[in-house]
Amino acid sequence: MAERELFEVKIICDFAAAHLLRNFRGKCEHLHGHNWKVEVVVRGHKLNESEILLDFGELKEAARKVVEELDHKFLNDLPAFKDRNPSSENIARYIYRRLSERFEGYDFWVHSVTAWESPNSCATYYGNSVG
């Protein structure tokens, strides 16, 4: 049986935002902010007619549009986080889902989104891409 090739493309973007964590005891229950770094990983088995998985620029633009919704905002006030904590985990999930909607039907898929709230702390969401 022939092995299937797997290609992976990754882009990084950033945004700045404030938040606080509800139902949490510790420093993060108070209003504070981060300069977030977001890593988006896209995977696919097939290159297009240009022999690329997708154009980096197209992925960067799609990610930019999503993080623009979060940039310089108080995340708790956004509809996506009204009933859900704007934790690193939930921010990664939000960005993953928005990008997955954007690229639905393509020959590749969003594999993961990682939200870094500091150089040493991050959370990754894989959605349905694992298994």
What are these regions (language model features)?
Residues 1-131:
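Charge-rich, low-complexity N-terminal segments
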